[in-house]
Each structure stands twice: as structure tokens, then as C-alpha cells.
């Protein structure tokens, strides 16, 4: 008998709703939570529930066959991966009853959550430097700062590789990979690169892990570490079992099929994979001693319908115990994460972005999108301490950008409300409240609409002691953008912008 591989994860998140019959509410609470947390009907408008989401759910519960017309691709691979049940998980009557609860409680429309007047259009203390050379059109998937080497990495869909830039955004090298780089971790002379394979959602396994080794003469040697993987999203290199050999943690985001795993280095360019989470949607991972026991843990943010933050507590010998720090409804759209001690208590805290809004061609703004700060309370517990609304929040970095002794947050939005608040494509949340009171003021730079910022990183690229920011623009997506803005991006938008910090 087919069973949902994510059974038991669900929790109710939709309280206080009065429309619909008790039987409809019970049907939704009974059936939906076998695979994910109970969705909140208010997170999507009624047309999206009716025309987009519920028809797809009929397929996912086995009441309708998957078709390309319904938005499914690589159907044979999905069936082989058991993405669909062999038998219906519920009757049509039960589905229709549960569906009525979502439709009855959904709003007719959703409003933007950002107030345009609250964003200060002046980024004090930063100079804006655009990369003079550009990929035409800009399709940047990787923006990474190597502070130790004073280098910037720029990956692009069309280039199928990455460029190495100097601190002034001068192009020094180019590495063609034959694949799309989306994440890179530097380990000595090695650039560990995660390649997604397909930028848009597919099941065809074309993901790769490459180790690019810099030779003394400036050339690169390439080692194909792993291939034939679902779509990758992040890679982090560390010694995870204490044997002195480099391992790496890998986010295999996939689409319907994916996983999170760590790869054990065996020497002689060999690695063994250990799967820690057999679910798609792993977005970001951070190796960190989160529980302060002196052993390295893995903090993993998972999107898709799981929408959870997991802590894998390490034993320093390669063993990991999974803890769920939180789980949100499947419409949450987790997209970015950083780890830093915000309140100065010695415990690493987590700042998270949720704003992925590419599920449907006409995805409306979502009232729950934004940036959230979770304080580490020990005992595998986190507490939400602050929420900053931000349409389409995507990538972020926590640093003391103004060097006043507390942490600020830089964040991009890949899905801003272009009609009401187009400048929220990049926001700097400057902390004016210190380490005990969260008072973040929003600002952006005047040229913030010059690109659609998918990629971001922060680090001291010029070696002057303060934190700079790089933004990478990807201008082609099937979601709605004003035609004038899109034309501007295509013709003259930069591939990358450096926000050079002048705090020192």
C-alpha cells in the first residue's frame, strides 16, 4: 500500500476561520496533514485555490492522472520515483468536502504587504559599482564572495560556468562547466561547485558536484565528484566525522524528487553519500555547532511542501540525529537562511527568508512573506523574535554592516510587488535597537530596480575591514513583470552589482 513518505509531519496552522462546515474543516485537517502542515486558506486568493492549486492536488492524491496540461513534466520519472500514489488516498467526496473549506475561507484577492513609503531610497555608507561587462541577457545564478582571496564569483545560465572577479569587479578568469552553477564553497585551493542541471523545475537528474582546483600557474583542474543528481541548491564543505578528510553537505532540492545528504570523504577522490532527509526542497544548509556541545551540527532549511527548519545534531563521528525546529504551511515558500548570534548570548540564531512565489503563472502577493529572526533557546528550540514583511523575500545575509556593534540584515526579493513596491528588490534592514530590542529600518539604493536580484552574498571583498554586498541579476522568469522594466533589464541591466561598504 502506498503511503505518503512525509506522513506525520503535519500540524495545524489555520486557526480562527469560521466559514465552511465543521465537516469540511475536519476533512481538511484529517487528510491534508498526512503529507504536510495544514494550509491556511488565507495564504492564497480564491482564484488561485480554485484554478491552480486544488486541480494539482487532485493529481497528488491519486484522483486524476498526471498530465502535461496539468503542469506536470517528466511524468515517467515521477512515477518511477513514486511521487504519485498507486491508489487514491481519499474519495472524491472527501476531497471535494476538504476543498470547500479552503475555497470558502480564501479571500477574493490579496494585497501587497509592503508600504512603499517606509523604504528609504538612500543607502548611506555604500557606493554602487556595476559590473561593466555583462552576460547578455543577465541570467546570474551565483554571486559569491571569497573574502580571504579577495575574489567574487559570478555564475550564469547562458555562460554555463562561472567567472572569477577581482575586488573591483574586474573579470580575471572564466571557468566553463557545461552546467549551471548555483552554489560554491571555497576550501583552500579548491572551489567546490554545485550545479543545478535544470534551472526551471524538472526531474531529469543533471545536477553535478565539481571540485575546481587552482594550480600555481592560474589554471584549473576539474574533478567530477558526483553527477546524475536532481537539481542542486547548496553545498558546504567541512570535516563532518572528525577523520581529517574533507566531507561536504549537499542540498538536493530537486522538484518532486530530492534529498539532503552528507558525503563522506574516503580519500583518493572518493566519497560515500549518507542520506539524512529523503525529501525534496532542501534550500540552504549551514554546518554550525548549534547546540553548543562542541560538535558540528547541520542546520537545514527545507522548502516545497515540507517548509521546515531541521537541525541534524552531529556526534563528531558521522552520526546525526534529526530535530524539527519549526514547520510551516506548504504555501510558506522558504528561500534563504543565515546564521549569526543576534542577541549576544553566545548561541547561534537563525534568520530566514520566505518569499518563493513561482508556483503559479499568476501567483498573487502573499501576506506571510518576509524575513524572520529566530532566537536559539537551546534544547533544539527556536523562538520567533521579529518579522519584517517583504514581498517575495529570497536571499539574505546577517552582518554588522554599519559597524555599530549589532547585526543588520541584507535581503533580496526575487518576487517584489512591481506595481506597488518595486524597490523592495533589495532591502537593507539596519538594526537601530541593539541586541535586545529589534528595530530594523529599511533602505535601498536608487538603482535597485536595475536588475532582478536572484543571487546575493556579503563579505569583505576589498580587505578594508567592513562587509560589502554583491547582487546577481536573473531577468527571465515566467512570472509577471512590467514590460518597460523587463525591456530595460534585457537591454542594459547589469549581471552583477557591488555595494561597496564605506564604514571603514
Per-range role (PLM):
Residues 17-21, 25, 31-504:
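Beta-propeller-forming repeat regions
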Residues 3, 10-14:
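Boundary at the C-terminal end of the N-terminal hydrophobic targeting segment
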Amino acid at each position: 500500500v502506498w503511503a505518503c513518505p512525509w506522513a506525520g509531519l503535519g500540524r495545524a496552522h489555520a486557526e480562527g476561520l469560521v466559514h465552511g462546515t465543521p465537516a469540511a474543516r475536519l476533512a481538511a485537517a484529517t487528510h491534508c496533514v498526512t503529507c504536510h502542515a495544514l494550509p491556511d486558506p488565507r495564504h492564497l486568493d480564491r482564484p488561485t485555490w480554485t484554478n491552480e492549486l486544488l486541480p494539482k492536488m487532485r493529481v497528488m492524491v491519486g484522483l486524476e492522472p498526471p498530465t502535461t496540461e496539468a503542469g506536470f513534466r517528466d511524468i515517467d520519472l515521477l512515477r518511477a520515483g513514486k511521487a504519485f500514489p498507486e491508489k487514491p488516498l481519499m474519495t472524491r467526496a472527501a476531497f471535494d468536502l476538504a476543498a470547500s473549506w479552503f475555497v470558502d475561507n480564501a479571500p477574493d484577492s490579496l494585497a501587497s504587504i509592503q508600504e512603499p513609503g517606509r523604504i528609504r531610497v538612500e543607502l548611506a555608507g555604500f557606493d554602487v559599482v556595476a559590473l561593466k561587462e555583462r552576460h547578455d541577457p543577465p541570467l546570474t545564478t551565483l554571486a559569491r564572495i571569497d573574502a580571504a582571496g579577495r575574489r567574487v564569483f559570478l555564475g550564469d545560465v547562458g555562460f554555463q560556468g562561472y567567472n572569477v572577479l577581482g575586488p573591483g569587479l574586474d573579470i580575471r578568469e572564466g571557468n566553463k562547466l557545461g552546467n549551471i552553477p548555483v552554489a560554491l564553497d571555497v576550501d583552500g585551493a579548491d572551489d567546490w561547485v554545485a550545479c543545478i542541471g535544470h534551472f526551471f523545475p524538472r526531474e531529469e537528474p543533471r545536477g553535478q558536484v565539481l571540485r575546481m582546483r587552482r594550480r600555481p600557474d592560474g589554471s584549473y583542474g576539474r574533478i567530477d565528484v558526483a553527477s546524475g543528481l536532481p537539481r542542486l541548491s547548496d553545498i558546504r564543505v567541512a570535516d563532518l566525522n572528525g577523520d581529517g578528510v574533507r566531507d561536504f553537505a549537499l542540498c538536493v532540492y530537486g522538484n518532486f524528487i530530492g534529498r539532503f545528504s552528507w558525503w563522506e570523504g574516503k580519500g583518493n577522490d572518493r566519497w560515500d553519500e549518507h542520506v539524512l532527509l529523503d525529501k525534496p526542497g532542501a534550500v540552504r544548509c549551514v554546518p554550525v555547532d548549534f547546540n553548543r556541545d562542541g560538535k558540528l551540527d547541520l542546520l537545514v532549511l527545507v522548502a516545497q511542501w515540507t517548509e521546515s527548519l531541521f537541525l541534524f545534531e552531529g556526534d563528531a563521528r558521522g552520526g546525526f540525529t534529526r530535530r524539527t525546529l519549526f514547520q510551516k504551511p506548504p504555501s510558506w515558500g522558504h528561500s534563504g537562511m543565515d546564521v549569526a548570534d543576534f542577541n549576544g548570548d553566545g548561541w547561534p540564531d537563525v534568520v530566514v527568508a520566505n518569499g518563493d512565489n513561482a508556483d503559479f503563472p499568476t501567483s498573487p502577493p502573499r501576506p506571510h512573506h518576509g524575513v524572520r529572526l529566530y532566537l536559539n533557546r537551546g534544547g533544539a528550540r527556536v523562538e520567533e523574535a521579529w518579522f519584517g514583511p517583504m514581498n517575495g523575500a529570497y536571499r539574505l545575509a546577517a552582518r554588522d554592516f554599519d559597524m555599530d556593534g549589532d547585526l543588520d540584515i541584507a535581503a533580496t526579493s526575487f518576487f517584489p510587488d512591481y506595481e506597488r513596491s518595486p524597490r523592495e528588490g533589495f532591502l537593507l534592514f539596519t538594526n537601530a535597537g541593539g541586541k535586545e530590542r529589534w528595530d530594523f529600518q529599511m533602505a535601498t539604493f536608487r538603482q535597485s530596480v536595475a536588475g532582478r536580484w536572484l543571487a546575493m552574498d556579503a563579505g569583505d571583498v576589498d580587505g578594508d575591514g567592513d562587509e560589502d554586498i554583491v547582487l546577481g541579476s536573473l531577468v527571465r522568469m515566467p512570472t509577471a513583470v512590467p514590460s518597460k522594466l523587463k525591456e530595460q533589464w534585457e537591454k542594459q541591466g547589469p549581471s552583477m552589482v557591488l555595494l561597496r561598504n564605506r564604514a571603514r
